[in-house]
């Protein structure tokens, strides 16, 4: 009996010992030692078996990562860095599903691994491109590797951009040259890695800077000739223009450095090249003024003062059209350049200064108790029958000259009796002066002077046109219409020499055939119609706030439909019509198709944008144009189906269903040739791959 009790006691002790061992967590990582040994194969005496910054317990119980693999998702970022520093998913190599692994985004492209729309801040040419520092990426020494990558992956010094002092930054060694950032001579040949880089071509991108200068001095990309995409080579920026090769707009004036140097001839280091108080970009893009001329309209006020102080028009020398230029009003007469009658006496400032010699700032210049305007109204200085005030304010005639147009009729007679124009000696443009017509008894309003027969004396004696040809100059307007209606020259098909015939101007474009620039935008009507395809009746045809003439001055070097300035803004190549070589010009991509001119396959379906538009008719912005479950690229390159037809063989099954679900021939409506369409067989639960066979 005593033996039995001894045996039971021994069994009980052993059980307690086992329970004690099984309940033990030696390293305090949240996993029992027995589980670490038998289940997870981790070290029960090391809380972080894979040294990734997460305890084994956290990896198993919270994050479901591998406690023996410091980088569970193989994205080149340790699990601990992902959880503790970046906030990315340590089990998903591409946390934001943008097609780039988290490691590539953090260590190579320097984009946000949690934002699918984040963009790189340097040349997308590879890891050697030096980019601006992003604090969230934590790159203390700006060597192109995050501190976490340096410490946890490469074991380099996160505070030394060139840990092995070989002349190459740690980032360049890892991402571009694939050399050892901790070994100055990775191949042990006696020549440092920095000295070996491109030994026969010291300037890899041909930008005028050696690779060593780009890496060590300027932080530019030795494989990208124009690191900031401003249209100037990095070497040209550093050595010639002294601009920042990492900043496309060195002076922050709204114009790219390349545009300033190449097109506008402004100073890319001075935001206000003409020192007129307006930034160069503001002058070109907003006001249409000349960034190299401080006084674009030559009115005596600089452009900046006109815009910022006086609120006058920097392109109009007489903003209030009172006959006195803005500068004279401000600096000489001290009148208001935006008010044609500064003293409100009823006489425009110009008339007071130039005609009446009164004070434009004093409504009663002679202090006689009668306003200047009233005094002028009562006076007829030239005795032509029109008060001086009416001559100035209504008819714009000379109050000191009774016959302003020297046609033999007084201004008063023309206005009151004959209703002819006192400023036009030949009101009806028939070649006979108004005074002559009154003298001989003809009508100064009627250009037709009847003779015996059907011909007119005007045609025979004055205009020289052919009385037997109703359209002497073949411009599309009859001679009568030209003389009597439009006041154009019946012998000159293009009276205003603007490049459009008078008939085209009147009948087609509705422009003024006597005015070469109908909309006053600085471009002739012919140039607008024939060259620039702009509206000759609208000074800003595209309503973008920039006058047509200013836009016409902007160069389109590659003829892709985008101005070089716009290309700098869109970061395309202004000297290459198709920057991404996808078969569509940059202009067509931006203005028409809304695709990415720097990505030859905008929707990532495996088919270049140009082929989608020009060859297959598919949508370059939709990877699956016909929504059949197959990408356009798969349809074109693999299955030879129609990417714009969801059911290429019209059998009642979509191409995607045939390929991925039923494994039938998406190009053959009856895969088994049994006389029944694949779709009908699926509906009838028969096998579309076997003749009349039930599934």
From Swiss-Prot:
It holds the Pfam family TSP3_bac. Residues 271-283, 291-306, 313-324, 361-370, 381-392, 467-477, 491-500, 537-546 have a biased composition (Acidic residues). Transmembrane segments: none annotated. Residues 1-20 form the signal peptide. One of its GO terms (cellular component) is extracellular region. The keyword Lipid metabolism does not apply. It is found in: Secreted; Endoplasmic reticulum. PROSITE patterns: EF_HAND_1. Residues 45-695 are annotated as: Disordered. This is Calcium-binding acidic-repeat protein. GO terms for molecular function: calcium ion binding. May function as a calcium-binding protein. Keywords: Calcium, Endoplasmic reticulum, Repeat, Secreted, Signal.
């Amino acid at each position: 009996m005593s033996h039995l009790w001894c045996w039971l006691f021994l069994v009980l002790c052993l059980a307690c010992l086992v329970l004690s061992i099984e309940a033990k967590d030696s390293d305090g990582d949240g996993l029992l030692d027995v589980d670490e040994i038998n289940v997870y194969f981790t070290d029960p005496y090391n809380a972080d078996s894979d040294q990734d910054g997460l305890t084994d317990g956290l990896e198993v119980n919270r994050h479901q990562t591998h406690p023996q693999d410091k980088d569970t998702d193989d994205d080149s970022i340790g699990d601990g860095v992902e959880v503790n520093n970046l906030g990315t998913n340590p089990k998903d190599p591409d946390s934001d599903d943008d097609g780039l692994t988290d490691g590539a985004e953090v260590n190579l492209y320097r984009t946000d691994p949690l934002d699918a729309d984040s963009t790189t801040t340097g040349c997308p040419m590879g890891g050697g491109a030096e980019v601006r520092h992003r604090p969230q990426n934590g790159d203390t020494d700006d060597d192109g590797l995050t501190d976490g990558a340096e410490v946890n992956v490469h074991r380099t010094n996160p505070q030394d951009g060139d840990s092995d002092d070989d002349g190459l930054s740690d980032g360049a060694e890892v991402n571009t040259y694939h050399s050892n950032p901790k070994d100055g001579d990775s191949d042990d040949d006696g020549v440092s890695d920095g000295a070996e880089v491109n030994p026969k071509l010291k300037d890899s991108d041909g930008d005028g800077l050696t690779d060593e200068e780009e890496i060590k001095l300027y932080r530019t990309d030795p494989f990208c000739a124009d690191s900031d995409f401003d249209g100037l080579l990095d070497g040209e920026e550093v050595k010639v223009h002294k601009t920042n090769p990492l900043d496309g707009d060195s002076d922050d004036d709204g114009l790219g450095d390349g545009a300033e140097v190449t097109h506008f001839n402004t100073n890319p280091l001075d935001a206000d090249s003409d020192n007129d108080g307006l930034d160069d970009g503001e002058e070109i893009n907003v006001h249409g003024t000349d960034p190299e001329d401080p006084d674009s309209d030559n009115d005596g006020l600089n452009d900046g003062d006109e815009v910022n102080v006086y609120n006058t028009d920097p392109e109009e020398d007489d903003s209030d059209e009172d006959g006195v230029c803005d500068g004279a009003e401000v600096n000489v007469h001290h009148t208001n350049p935006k008010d044609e009658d500064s003293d409100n006496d009823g006489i425009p400032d110009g008339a007071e200064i130039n005609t009446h010699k009164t004070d434009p700032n004093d409504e009663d210049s002679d202090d006689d108790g009668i306003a200047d305007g009233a005094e002028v109204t009562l006076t007829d200085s030239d005795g032509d029958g029109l008060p001086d005030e009416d001559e100035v304010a209504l008819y714009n005639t000379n109050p000191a000259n009774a016959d302003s147009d020297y046609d033999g009729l007084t201004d008063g007679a023309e206005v009151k009796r004959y209703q002819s124009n006192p400023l036009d000696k030949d009101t009806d443009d028939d070649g006979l002066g108004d005074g002559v017509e009154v003298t001989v008894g003809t009508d100064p309003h009627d250009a037709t002077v009847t003779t015996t027969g059907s011909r007119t004396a005007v045609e025979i004696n004055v205009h020289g046109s052919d009385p037997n040809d109703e359209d002497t100059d073949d411009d599309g307007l009859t001679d009568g219409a030209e003389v009597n209606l439009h006041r154009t020259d019946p012998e000159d098909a293009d009276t205003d020499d603007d490049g459009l015939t008078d008939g085209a101007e009147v009948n087609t474009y509705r422009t003024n055939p006597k005015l070469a620039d109908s909309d006053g935008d600085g471009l002739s009507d012919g140039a607008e119609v024939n060259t620039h395809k702009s509206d000759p009746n609208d000074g800003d045809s595209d309503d973008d706030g920039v006058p047509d003439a200013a836009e016409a001055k902007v160069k389109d070097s590659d003829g892709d439909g985008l101005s070089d300035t716009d290309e700098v803004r869109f970061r395309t190549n202004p000297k290459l019509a198709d920057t991404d070589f996808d078969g569509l010009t940059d202009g067509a991509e931006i203005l028409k198709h809304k695709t990415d001119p720097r990505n030859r396959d905008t929707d990532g379906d495996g088919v270049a944008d140009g082929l989608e538009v020009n060859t297959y008719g598919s949508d370059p912005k939709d990877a699956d144009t016909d929504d059949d479950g197959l990408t356009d690229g798969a349809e074109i390159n693999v299955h030879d189906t129609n990417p714009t037809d969801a059911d290429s063989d019209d059998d009642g099954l979509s191409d995607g269903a045939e390929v991925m679900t039923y494994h039938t021939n998406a190009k053959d409506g009856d895969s088994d040739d049994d006389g029944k369409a694949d779709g009908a067989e699926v509906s009838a639960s028969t096998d579309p791959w076997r003749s009349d066979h039930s599934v």
